[in-house]
């Protein structure tokens, strides 16, 4: 989780069977901090944001299409969602981050990197291609974090230019 406008960042890795811990952790932060998940699996439990060398492999191609600054927010959100829905092949999952939209194409099989930055760069090229085709945000890195659906996107002062109020991230 990240505190808007700076402050402490908290990173936790939860395992299957820790649903009570997850709920407690989320409730402590909901509406006060932005809560994220890593798109791709890590090699070990993390206590800080993972780097490329911490990523085990790619399980999804991803993209983030945000409204363009200076344009009408609702028209831009409609544009972003339309771009994703009309893209071929269609994303497996579309998340409304509360600002823009994130598209995920789940792979049939994880493409392993085992922390190799060279292999990560090869796989990031797929994200970059989708990013270019959709005129999306620069977020093609394999260690990317994205807003967790079901949590509130809390914009800080800088983000309020694009997202004037809090918004719930949804699938």
Which residue ranges define each predicted feature?
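Signature for HUH/AEP ssDNA processing cores
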Residues: 1-99, 107-125, 132
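Catalytic "initiation/cleavage/transfer" segments centered on a nucleophilic residue
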Residues: 132-171
């Amino acid at each position: 989780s990240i505190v808007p406008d700076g402050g402490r960042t908290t990173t936790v890795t939860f395992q299957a069977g820790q649903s009570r811990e997850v709920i407690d952790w989320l409730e402590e932060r909901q509406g006060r901090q932005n809560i994220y998940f890593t798109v791709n699996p890590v090699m070990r439990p993390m206590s800080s944001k993972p780097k490329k060398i911490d990523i085990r492999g790619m399980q999804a191609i991803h993209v983030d299409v945000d409204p363009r600054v200076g344009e009408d927010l609702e028209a831009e959100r409609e544009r972003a969602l339309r771009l994703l829905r009309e893209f071929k092949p269609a994303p497996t999952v579309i998340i409304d981050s509360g600002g823009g939209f994130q598209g995920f194409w789940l792979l049939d099989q994880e493409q392993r990197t085992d922390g190799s930055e060279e292999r990560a760069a090869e796989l990031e090229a797929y994200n970059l291609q989708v990013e270019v085709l959709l005129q999306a945000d620069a977020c093609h890195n394999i260690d990317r974090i994205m807003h967790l659906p079901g949590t509130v996107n809390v914009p800080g002062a800088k983000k309020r230019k694009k997202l004037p109020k809090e918004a719930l991230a949804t699938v």
